[in-house]
Amino acid sequence: MKKLFLIFAVLLMTDLIAAKENQTVKLNSGYEMPTLGLGTWTLTGETCENAVYAALKSGYRLIDTAKYYGNESEVGNAIRRATKDGICKREEIFVTTKLVPWSNNPDRDIDDSLKQLGLSYIDLCLLHQHGSASGDDAVYKAMIRAVKDGKIRSIGISNFYTEKTVSHFIKNFEIPPTVIQNENHLKYQNNSLRDWAAKKRIYIESYYPFGGRGHTKEHLQNETVLEIARAHGKSAAQIIVRWHLQSGYIAIPGSSNPAHIAENFDVWDFELTENEMKKLNALDTGQRYENW
């Protein structure tokens, strides 16, 4: 298993270092997904729209939203602004949204997300979290129908942390998850799920890459992180983002500050050493901050 993951990580790193404009991985659906994006949880109104626009202007091509966030229309507005201003084309942007498991009509919710985003297709749609068994299955089946109808390109799940819970979607549905989006950071690395998922050609996507609100300071002021940051002339945030990427994760740090957004993306001109990665890996305590 360890050897397989090392091969998986090397292939990912080859993509990352190759070119700033080509930081993508190939999903088991056949589509390319950027490895670094902007998370928009808690961002609303003009703040959200301006943050997404700033991200696209800084080079990001992965934008993460969700129906539950209530900001899909603002994300869509930013995408239209960016494409109109010639910053990027729609087909260059990878948009992720999520559906809640308690939906009474997930097919309608998918259509509503498309309407709110102002898009003809969604690149990746995730089951946002575990609900009831019947609710989870209903949403997942709706996403599969949407794939067949051309409304969604890839599907996945979020907040599923064990092989057993993830295996349900692999064994019981014709289209497996491409991505598992979970809480993932230096203090909670869940390497066993990452290594197992790699064997299934499923990527782990890290939300809360800096620990999440209320814990960011603890991560950014960690002395091991700061020591490595000084060695590279980089910020603590950049070291942590780089750790996620070199560990084989997709990362979606969130921010509304254009300077921080740009800083988090400026990670393509250096690489952490094997020893530095070991030091950062050793910070794992198995501690999650959320119970979703």
Language-model features: where?
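Sec-dependent N-terminal signal peptides
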Residues: 4-13
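Acidic (Asp/Glu)-rich catalytic clusters
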Residues: 27-28, 76-90, 111-120, 145-147, ...
